[in-house]
Amino acid sequence: MEILLQKVYDQENLSKEEMTMIATEIFEGRLSKTKIAAFLMALKVKGETAEEMAGIAQAMQQVAIQVAFPAGTAMDNCGTGGDKSNSFNISTTSAFVLAAAGIPVAKHGNRSISSRSGSADVCQELGIDINMRPEDMTYLLEKVGIAFLFAPHVHPNMKYVMDVRKELGTPTIFNLIGPLTNPVHLETQLMGIYRRDLLEQTAEVLGQLGRKRAVVLNGAGFMDEASLAGENHYALYENGEVHLYTLRPEDVGLTSYPLEAITGGDAKENAAILRSVLDGEPGAYLDTVLLNAGFGLFANGKVATVQEGVDLARDLIRSGLAKQKLADLITYQKEVLAK
């Protein structure tokens, strides 16, 4: 093990198998916090390869608590975080729009690592229980079409790195591979990433992990979401191939806004923003969700273009269907908890 760690310290790439070996040591609690921190920072400085990302993602999935759901029907739209944008919870809001379109959404997420409010924080503020049993998550996916999968709950072995990640206060490979490790077997996925240089590589990794279709995007301002502030870069994985594209908000009939227009706050403030969007309140928050939900619908294959996705997302919010998904999730969750 020391030899493998030294390879990373010496800026040498690891094979997929070597990374799996180190990850297994971490997830079984056999590496000290000091060594984990040194490893993560050395890997960050060196730069993570597709082989390394796939290796650690597979190791995480092997020790995850599995959530049963028909293979190939659910999707996720969580991002890596770590973009330092301090935006509101865009992907969490968009998830209710995707669910309203009839797409089962297994929303994988965590508490805040490098922002004021993570998806788990805002979900709790909305009244969503983030510690449901796996069978309850399955029930909600079947009955409502959306369930929140709290990362530390479904990945209990991540307890060995949580304190280290929080103390480092900077994105690591775990930000990159977190969205790759959903315990539900996904067929499609939208994944935002804070590093534009890893778009193609990450799309390839999603293919290696069994996705049939996926979009990996990096927004203007290097956000891990699609942004109204300028040009968005994204990679589309389909049929074993990756193609790179760009898209500006004007391309799909949306107005440009500066990044400051979508600044969020703490969990309470972000929950209020989420509700305002689902209520259809016009402005930068709504348009940002329309763009991101549009990308999600496109990634799923529900629509043929992002433009069609934006139009459908607008209809789903105007009709009240997206807002109803939030209400249904809370209602059926109470039913589960009452058993």
From Swiss-Prot:
Biological processes per GO annotation: L-tryptophan biosynthetic process
What is its cofactor?
Answer: Mg(2+)
Q: Where does Mg(2+) 2 bind?
A: D224, E225
- Which EC number(s) are documented for this chain? 2.4.2.18
- Gene Ontology CC terms: cytosol
Question: Which residues are recorded as binding 5-phospho-alpha-D-ribose 1-diphosphate?
Answer: 79, 82-83, 87, 89-92, 107-115, 119
Which Gene3D superfamilies did the record assign?
Nucleoside phosphorylase/phosphoribosyltransferase catalytic domain, Transferase, Pyrimidine Nucleoside Phosphorylase, Chain C
User: What exactly does this protein do?
Assistant: Catalyzes the transfer of the phosphoribosyl group of 5-phosphorylribose-1-pyrophosphate (PRPP) to anthranilate to yield N-(5'-phosphoribosyl)-anthranilate (PRA).
PANTHER family for the chain: ANTHRANILATE PHOSPHORIBOSYLTRANSFERASE
Instruction: State what protein this is by name.
Output: Anthranilate phosphoribosyltransferase
Gene that codes for this?
trpD
